[in-house]
């Protein structure tokens, strides 16, 4: 994305050893920034530790983002290296279960809320002092178009994503006086393994074939297509740039104009 480059910023990205998180990290590395990454997938972490920029402009650790003690330990490690950060991207998220509410397991609900919502709280809680030390900065929360519509058979996921938008709006008001901007990105259906798993689960739940489900997902957006992780990464780069310095409390959709979710 052709935005003004502001090099040498310290940026924390959760769930960033693979997929969208790693895509955002690579875009930001190209901008000249230093990224502090974390993930629960040790195999992917080990792969990134072979990168030529490791311990120079890439730092990565194992973190269970849904566990407050794990997140606290991670931030203690970061604080031993640097005293401030410029930005936090809360990227952790899972698809959660698919099915009627009465059939869902309590543990499935709790895992979805812990991962998709509580992780944002934990990371943000410990990031705020580092952002204040920086005299300002930016927080990006990854929500979803499921946080803008009702989403039958995906209630835990939708509830968690609506909550992320509430978190974003409230924090933007709370942190504005410290020159900390807070925005949410709402991706639509993003091409990749996660949407493939969702399609498979929904097809099984409804007793129809996966091709039908995929076509219906595509039809939910005016542009009749899925988005790519690079589209989301471009939006993140923009929101962290100087060009977005007056944008806060906003919900930015990157979804091909979702018209419905069902």
Predicted regions and their residues:
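Short C-terminal tail/terminal secondary-structure segment
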Residues: 2, 95-98, 149, 237, ...
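Canonical Rossmann dinucleotide-binding motif of NAD(H)/NADP(H)-dependent dehydrogenases/reductases
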Residues: 3-36
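Substrate-binding pocket helix/loop in short-chain dehydrogenase/reductase
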Residues: 99-101, 108-113, 217
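Active-site helix of classical SDR
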Residues: 124, 160, 168
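Residue(s) in the substrate-gating loop at a strand-loop-helix junction
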Residues: 144
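Short, small/polar-rich loop/turn modules that mediate ligand/substrate recognition or access, typified
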Residues: 176, 181, 247-249
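C-terminal helical subdomain
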Residues: 184, 208-243, 247, 254-256
